[in-house]
């Protein structure tokens, strides 16, 4: 039973370890899911940033197109003004030159301004392109990270499934062992109760045997007393017979005391009858004592047979209990080997 309890405790420890490993795997799976959700959220935010950068890039390209169009329009206007200047040669030279210089300065300033804006837009465009490339690289890194997290999640799920399967097997084995333990405990309790009952029966049989021995001793003692009384009665009967003989001789010798002799004879006859009755009574009591002694001997023999049978049953029950223990050890060894 101690070995069974130790094995059950070991199996409970294994079950607790499997439960702890399953909880750890579940926690790792939850952490992996959390990391995957966080990575997906970061990917969504980066996607939004990329969308924003693309929108800004489109706006920048549109602004660049507008600026380029305006620059072309200014160039066309400048060329038209040059043509107009050639056509208006009748205007005074000083005024015309001043106007042209002023227009040229304004045009140059506007061109410089548009060039600066164009360069600024180019820089912003390059910056947006760089930002877009960085965002794409971050997205690629996040995608790789998500893939690694998904692989880690799959491995965690596999470990969780394996741990769950092992936990289920351990639970089933523990349940089967628990059922087997309960069955064996019930059998052991039944065997113990039966052994207690047999021990009680054996004690009762021994007590009855002791009582029978006591009764036998008492009967033997009474029988010895009866035999002694019988011997004394026989002696008294012999003495009575001797007295009768003497009285008869006295009766034959003494004729004068006939009445007294007759009275003595009657008394002797009465005493003889009494002795005979006592002898019959003693014989009856002797037969009864012998019958009781025989009954006591038969009772002792029956009780001895019952004691022998109970001892044989006890030996058989011990052997059966030993066989059950061996079967239990074999079953636990098979369970351990299966694991």
UniProtKB/Swiss-Prot annotation:
A biological process term (GO) from this entry: oogenesis
Cellular compartments per GO CC: actin filament; cytosol; investment cone; sarcomere
Keywords assigned by UniProt, alphabetized: Actin-binding, Coiled coil, Cytoplasm, Cytoskeleton, Muscle protein
Record's keyword annotation contains Coiled coil: yes
Alphabetical list of InterPro entries matching this protein: Tropomyosin
Domain notes: The molecule is in a coiled coil structure that is formed by 2 polypeptide chains. The sequence exhibits a prominent seven-residues periodicity.
Name by which UniProt lists this protein: Tropomyosin-1, isoforms 9A/A/B
Organism expressing this protein natively: Drosophila melanogaster (Fruit fly)
Lineage: Eukaryota, Metazoa, Ecdysozoa, Arthropoda, Hexapoda
Underlying gene: Tm1
């Amino acid at each position: 039973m101690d070995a069974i309890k130790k094995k059950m405790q070991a199996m409970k420890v294994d079950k607790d370890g499997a439960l702890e490993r399953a909880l750890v795997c579940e926690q790792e799976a939850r952490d992996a899911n959390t990391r995957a959700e966080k990575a997906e959220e970061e990917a969504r935010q980066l996607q939004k940033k990329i969308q924003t950068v693309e929108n800004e890039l489109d706006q920048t390209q549109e602004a660049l197109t507008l600026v380029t169009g305006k620059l072309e329009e200014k160039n066309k206007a400048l060329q038209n003004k040059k043509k107009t200047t050639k056509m208006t040669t009748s205007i005074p030279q000083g005024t015309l030159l001043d106007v042209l210089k002023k227009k040229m300065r304004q045009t140059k300033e506007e061109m410089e301004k548009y060039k600066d804006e164009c360069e600024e837009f180019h820089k912003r465009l390059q910056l947006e392109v760089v930002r877009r490339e960085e965002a794409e690289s971050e997205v690629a890194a996040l995608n790789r990270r998500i893939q690694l997290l998904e692989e880690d999640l799959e491995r965690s799920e596999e470990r969780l499934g394996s741990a769950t399967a092992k936990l289920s097997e351990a639970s089933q084995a523990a349940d089967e062992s628990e059922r087997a333990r309960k069955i064996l405990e019930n059998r052991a309790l039944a065997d113990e109760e039966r052994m207690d009952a047999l021990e009680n029966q054996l004690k009762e049989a021994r007590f009855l045997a002791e009582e029978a021995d006591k009764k036998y001793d008492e009967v033997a003692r009474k029988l010895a007393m009866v035999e002694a009384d019988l011997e004394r009665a026989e002696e008294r009967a012999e003495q009575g017979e001797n007295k009768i003989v003497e009285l008869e001789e006295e009766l034959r010798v003494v004729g004068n005391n006939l009445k007294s002799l007759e009275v003595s004879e009657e008394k002797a006859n009465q005493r003889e009858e009494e002795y005979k009755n006592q002898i019959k009574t003693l014989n009856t009591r002797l037969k009864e004592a012998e019958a009781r002694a025989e009954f006591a001997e038969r009772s002792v023999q029956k009780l001895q047979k019952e004691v022998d049978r109970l001892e044989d049953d006890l030996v058989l029950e011990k052997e059966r209990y030993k066989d059950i223990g061996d079967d239990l050890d074999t079953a636990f060894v098979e369970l351990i080997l299966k694991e």
